[in-house]
A protein has these predicted regions:
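Intrinsically disordered, low-complexity terminal regulatory regions
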Residues: 1-82, 89-135
Length: 135
């Protein structure tokens, strides 16, 4: 969905924070992001590391609210370890797009996995390690 169509105001706050760390048209780097500056959202935030060849995504941090909702903590695990393979494939595709386009992306997801009948929004924000290491 277009970023401006997000319904969750918390996501707008996180997006504003990310944009504030963007200097001179470059993506904010991982070192620019300080989780202590958005403590109010930490339980809802996942931080992922991007691995190359093959392209994989590994949870550096799985937010506690998300882990509780899903029934397991993915911290330290790759997305392909998610038991529900359609969800793993969806996540991989969405995150791969963020990496390829070097731009934020928003999604509204309706799911019957975990909590039946749940709809939620996801905001994915790229933060490479260095300006030269982004694929």
């Amino acid at each position: 969905i277009p970023l401006e169509n997000l319904r969750d105001q918390r996501l707008f706050r996180v997006l504003d924070y990310w944009r504030s760390k963007s200097a001179q048209g470059r993506l904010p780097l991982r070192r620019d992001i300080d989780p202590s500056e958005f403590r109010w959202a930490l339980g809802l935030v996942c931080l992922l590391d991007v691995e190359q060849r093959p392209l994989r995504f590994r949870y550096r941090l799985d937010g506690s609210v998300i882990a509780t909702r899903n029934g397991h903590d993915m911290t330290g695990h790759a997305i392909d370890a998610i038991e529900h393979k359609p969800s793993a494939g969806m996540l991989h595709g969405q995150f791969a797009t963020v990496v390829a386009e070097k731009a934020p992306a928003a999604h509204r997801i309706a799911t019957e996995y975990g909590v039946a009948g749940t709809t939620y929004e996801r905001l994915s924000l790229p933060c490479p390690m260095t300006a030269t290491t982004w694929p």
